[in-house]
Design a protein with these regions (language model features):
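Expand to "…catalyze enediolate/carbanion chemistry for C-C bond making/breaking, isomerization
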Residues: 1-280
């Protein structure tokens, strides 16, 4: 499966931005038809969809689109963009599972990624994630979320810490991937720090609004396969000696961490050697 570490929102009708996005290295490119595309430009953005998705795929990215809620102009968005065969359809401002079921009916046969942008949506995350079998992930917003909470966005992101942790837990419990909120400031250092915080919490994917951040954030979310191999080797050696724990880089390695390292290697197409049997 192609990597999905970074999900870049791109203005729907800005052809220069479309070309820049194709060069930036983000894994998933999203033609954004909501906030990034003023209503007068949406017809133009819809007309660009088909050729745009082909160009993005030729550049090695997954081609996605974010449509407006169906109760506004989302159905008009879908009627146009589905002809371009996007790989993924995202929908903004999903607060309840009923919206997902309506989207699934309106967009048959394509992967769905609902976007959670309000307190109500956050409280319904588990139900939203289980609303349809074609849901590949959920994405949590930043700007709309802080507005709904009645606060403001900061570089440190303290105001969203609980939201991001709660969202990840709900998604994990539902068995779907969680895409972290974008860092909406321009500085690269802050973007990397924000991505590292998300990675430490357990996120494996992050949304972006600045294409210049893509390569650095990709590095943060690229699995450390070398360390996974060391973990497996050390634990297997310990197990062969009759122990159920080992140490790697000073860290205690027990069965859950060992099992996660094996899964990581298998998912990367580098299966570890067969498990050694414990002595005795």
């Amino acid at each position: 499966m192609a990597p999905r570490r970074t999900w870049l929102f791109v203005s729907g009708a800005d052809e220069a931005a479309h070309a820049a996005a194709a060069r930036c290295g983000a894994d998933v490119l999203i033609q954004e038809l909501e906030d990034f595309t003023p209503p007068p430009l949406r017809p133009q953005a819809r007309r660009l969809a088909g050729a745009l998705y082909d160009r993005w795929r030729e550049a090695g990215a997954l081609a996605a689109v974010r449509v407006n809620p169906l109760e506004t102009c989302g159905r008009e968005d879908l009627a146009a963009v589905l002809r371009g065969r996007p790989d993924i359809v995202l929908m903004s401002k999903v607060d309840a599972p009923e919206q997902v079921r309506a989207l699934a009916e309106a967009a048959p046969g394509v992967e769905l990624v609902p976007n959670v942008e309000t307190a109500r949506g956050l409280m319904n995350t588990f139900a939203i994630a289980r609303a349809d079998a074609r849901i590949g992930a959920l994405l949590v917003a930043s700007e709309d979320m802080v507005a709904d909470l009645g606060t403001s966005r900061s570089r440190g992101g303290e105001e969203l810490a609980y939201v991001r942790q709660r969202f990840l837990l709900e998604c994990r419990a539902a068995g779907v991937e969680a895409i972290d909120a974008p860092y909406t400031f321009s500085d690269a250092k802050g973007a990397v720090a924000d991505a590292k915080w998300a990675r430490a919490m357990g996120y494996r994917m992050k949304s972006l609004v600045d294409p210049s951040h893509a390569k650095a954030v990709n590095r943060v979310f690229t699995p450390d396969l070398a360390r996974a191999r060391r973990i497996v080797a050390a634990f297997e050696k310990a197990r062969a000696a009759g122990k159920e724990r080992a140490r790697v880089d000073g860290a205690l390695i027990e069965v859950p961490i060992y099992a996660a390292a094996r899964r990581l290697l298998e998912s990367a197409g580098q299966p570890p050697p067969p498990k050694r049997r414990r002595r005795g």
